[in-house]
């Protein structure tokens, strides 16, 4: 199927999720606004074709999921 983007498999989604969470954590630790962290993480998820990405950022933590309960992560910052 030319032109169609494949949805990443579960292992790849986990690796992508770790990458996006690390980026969000780095932004938050270096003083980025909460809105900017959420927005950046959502843009990154779209660029990796994660369809069901949800993120909630506080000043001291990040909560995110990528479609399933198995691919959910919380990070304290």
What are these regions (language model features)?
Residues 1-77:
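Soluble N-terminal domains of membrane-associated systems
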């Amino acid at each position: 199927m030319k032109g169609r983007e494949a949805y990443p498999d579960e292992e790849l989604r986990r690796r992508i999720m770790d990458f996006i969470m690390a980026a969000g954590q780095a932004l938050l630790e270096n003083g980025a606004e909460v809105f900017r962290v959420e927005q950046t993480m959502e843009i990154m998820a779209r660029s990796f074709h994660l369809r069901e990405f949800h993120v909630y950022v506080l000043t001291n933590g990040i909560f995110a999921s990528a479609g399933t309960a198995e691919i959910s992560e919380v990070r304290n910052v």
